[in-house]
Regions:
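Flexible "arm" and connector segments at domain edges
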Residues: 1-59, 65-187, 191-251
Length: 251
């Protein structure tokens, strides 16, 4: 047996034993694990952003454990088992890659990715975008799916023009009203347009913003270290001086 399969079988055996013998593991449910799984995914994301392959290995292991855990609970309930889940995704991969697994004609003229998704029974191209995704990732995924069927800017200049149009609308709204809902709506349109512009340019907006978040954290924490007293006690000019110093030293 391949080492990968041996390791996977070992994990499934351990989870099944823990479900029988460990007080904590015995009482877990789909619902109780859900938020912990979300946390694990974010921890994995951190290792990718921070380029930490050893930590990534650990987090992938934790995530595998969660996946097997869910499958073990499902098996106990008579819903499905881990082999059903794995075979299901295998069938999905084969169906979604007709250019590799299809007939001769399908290999020559494969349908688009979104056409394949619709053939699976989805009523909308956007059905595969989870409602619970963070707003920026959701916007990006909806735009990518719409672009997959041709609903897309022809070039980056048009996407840029849309950004400027939305920016002007924000400015107009700020000058003519104090209706916070309307202002918020216009900012949402501007953010959506910025995400579209970045996407057209080949920039992942989520990754771009995360890099800026990390840069801000690094510089702000240097400000805190360099301050001669608690940072909340400093005035605006002192804060700006510390910020510029941190900015110059952390480029």
């Amino acid at each position: 047996m391949k080492p990968e399969l041996q390791a996977f079988e070992r994990l499934t055996d351990i989870i099944e034993e823990l479900r029988q013998k460990c007080p904590w593991d015995k009482v877990q449910t789909f619902e109780s694990l859900r938020y912990l799984t979300i946390e694990e995914v974010y921890e994995l994301s951190d290792t990718i952003v921070e380029d930490q392959p050893e930590e990534m290995k650990k987090e992938l292991g934790d995530l595998f454990m969660h996946l097997v855990f869910y499958s073990s609970i499902a098996k106990e309930k008579g819903l499905f088992d881990i082999s059903d889940a794995i075979n299901g995704v295998c069938e999905k991969l084969i169906f979604r890659h007709p250019h590799i697994y299809g007939s001769g004609e399908e290999r020559q003229n494969p349908p688009s990715w979104e056409e394949i998704k619709m053939a699976e029974g989805r009523k909308s191209v956007l059905d595969g975008v989870p409602n619970s995704l963070p707003a920026m990732i959701k916007a990006l995924r909806m735009q990518e799916k719409a672009a997959g069927i041709g609903f897309n800017w022809k070039n980056s200049s048009l996407a840029h023009d849309k950004v400027m149009e939305e920016y002007r609308e924000v400015q107009e709204e700020l000058h003519k009203t104090d209706n916070q809902d309307r202002i918020e709506e216009e900012f949402g349109d501007l953010f959506f347009a910025l995400i579209g512009w970045a996407r057209i340019l080949g920039v992942n907006p989520e990754n771009a913003l995360e890099k800026t978040n990390r840069k801000f954290r690094q510089r702000f924490q240097k400000m805190e270290r360099d301050a001669d007293r608690t940072i909340s006690e400093l005035g605006t000019d002192e804060l700006l001086e510390l910020w510029n110093k941190a900015k110059n030293e952390t480029k």
